[in-house]
Amino acid sequence: MSDTQDNAPASAQGVDQKAAAGCPVAHDSVTAHGSESESPAIDSPTPHSGGRPRTNRDWWPNQLDLSVLSTNSAKVNPLGEDFAYAKEFAKLDVEALKRDIVEVLTTSQDWWPADFGHYGGLMIRLSWHAAGTYRIDDGRGGAGDGGQRFAPLNSWPDNVNLDKARRLLWPVKQKYGQKISWADLLVLAGNVALESMGFKTFGFGFGREDVWEPEEIFWGSEDTWVGDERYVSEKEFVAGVGATEMGLIYVNPEGPRGNADPAAAAHFIRETFRRMAMDDEETVALIAGGHTFGKTHGAGIADDHVGPEPEAAPLEAQGLGWMSSYASGAGADAISSGLEVTWTDRPTQWSNRFFEILFAYEWELTTSPGGAKQWVAKDAEAIIPDAYDAAKKHKPTMLTTDLSLRVDPAYERISRRFLENPDEFALAFAKAWYKLLHRDMGPVSRFLGPWVPEPQLWQDPVPAVDHALVGDADIAALKAKVLQSGLTTAQLVSTAWASAASFRHTDRRGGANGARVRLEPQRGWEVNQPEQLATVLTTLEGIQREFNAAGGTKISLADLIVLAGSAAVEKAARDAGFEVTVPFHPGRTDATQEQTDVESFQVLEPRADGFRNYLRPGEKAQPEVLLVDRAYMLNLTAPEMTVLIGGLRALEANVGGSRHGVLTDRPGVLTNDFFTNLLALGTRWKASESTEHVYEIRDLATDTVKWTASAVDLIFGSNSQLRALAEVYASEDAREKFVTDFVAAWTKVMELDRFDLA
């Protein structure tokens, strides 16, 4: 659905396409030889600031970026830490809200007139483009946080004039205040628009909470809008991005790189929609369903008339961009994509006319008034209404990407089936639209409101709790059983971590609930140590069977995996001299293999997990960069990441029993030895001559190797910010604080997917 068309970052995003440029995190400073510094023997770094005040990033552009671990902190939220969106939403009259949105849709404003007297097409595009940035690789993007309000999304060329749609909705947002988030409103508007034009939607879930600053997302390496450096061949573009060109949601509607070839376009449509978790049928349904309504806008040449995007617009524009000097600049004179296409002769009514018109004509290439490549029906009568003049009609027109649905063999088969079976098409579009709007929201348990349908497979469903939950006495007895089972602390901790740390905060997927670590594909992931995992699960399943057979309360394997890890943490703390109780809240259930889409879960397999000192073979990105990205996925702060690394090293949670970073002679005991030995004087670190990313810590006096460690371990002594945190935990008075903080961070990870506890 479209109305248009750095070098190595110190972030995990984008490193794949930049690996050839070298190490994404430089371990030496960037210097300018021959520059004048206080000491002429020392090269000075060359800052790159473009005239603005210089920051650390300008001086050291490859410095490890920890800022992502403090994005959208409570300090930037004007609603305060006590604000609970679910509680405010409960006060909302959703039917009244829907009526007010319909009023907006059908009340044309002079400052931005409605096409055909209805803003439905505009609002569908608004919602689509809010949700359509989602990508399966890392779960980033999507409509879940209202990020379209901020740069860069608010100024993408594919989002041209959606600022007007958001402004049209402002009176509704103003009226209901915090009872409805912008994130919910942006996608609800399109849903209501469909219903107001006669379409039966599949459902809708509220529950998206607003952010107050944009998420730092790598959208591509290009430094120009609609740049296409991401192409590595005529038929391939790099992994990790969702669109074919910078600033687009999916593909260029004129065709790949502006080449009006519907067959070539189909290849990239399929790939971009796959990266958003859509199959061929969903793709066809979405394109045809969305293009049943509204029109594109290309009344004139944009370069001659259209002003800057919102982020570049002057103060007096007040957040509006793309102001046009072409005639009135709006309505019939509007310029958005430069394309001038109205797909059907009923652009404000649900129908099957998109397919009927697509297959009724042969099509020839033409040029829009805005200079864009589009297609017009050969030998056709003018049957398409004008958006503003009831006396005018136009010949049918289509985009290059519309014709892909007829030219591509697989798409054509689906399209003809939908042409002949309108009800089947309507249901397919309803389900695909629902998936589009909700793909990044996680499980249905997070959804609010009265219109939520039954859970779908792509929502990773788990069964409801159907048994009495364990109490304190049961928990104590189960812990004792686990600790007497013969399983080691390292085995129990590693298994609990493997189960819980699959979570992605970006799209709320993964986590311990469901115990999917015992199912395909997770049970076979190298990072989860399949042989050890099978041993641990077999033992825990035996404990579970015995306990549940006694009658009364029961425990799921999902709960027992977490409880067993927590029991091991408590024992390790006790062995260190500290009595602690790791908080535990039963209520997880066990998913089945039938409830688990193997292909869908495959994207959750980590390329690295620094917490377990794991790096996938052949991985080119720097381990410490990937550690920060993993911490971000787990919604951790820098201090939480730090204390977890130290604790997990002490507990020997490394994959494969690796000794790297286990800087203690008391393994299995929850001590702060990792930090004290990492920062100890009288030693030096040396890169291993035989193993990449491995370092040796040697005694300065004897040059003997005392420990080995990974780059992930060393970064806590090398990076100045992380070293400051490590020093806290290495201090003499920090032993108890270390244990307390580790338990808190551990519990947070174990409960990341317990949305019912919020």
From Swiss-Prot:
Biased composition (Polar residues): 1-10
Claim: Iron is one of the keywords in the record: yes
Cofactor note: Binds 1 heme b (iron(II)-protoporphyrin IX) group per dimer.
GO biological process, one term: cellular response to hydrogen peroxide
Xref: SUPFAM superfamilies: Heme-dependent peroxidases
Entry EC no(s): 1.11.1.21
Active site residues of this protein: 129 (proton acceptor)
Keywords in alphabetical order: Heme, Hydrogen peroxide, Iron, Metal-binding, Oxidoreductase, Peroxidase
Essential cofactor(s): heme b
Superkingdom field: Bacteria
Functional summary from the UniProt entry: Bifunctional enzyme with both catalase and broad-spectrum peroxidase activity.
Family: Belongs to the peroxidase family. Peroxidase/catalase subfamily.
Record protein name field: Catalase-peroxidase
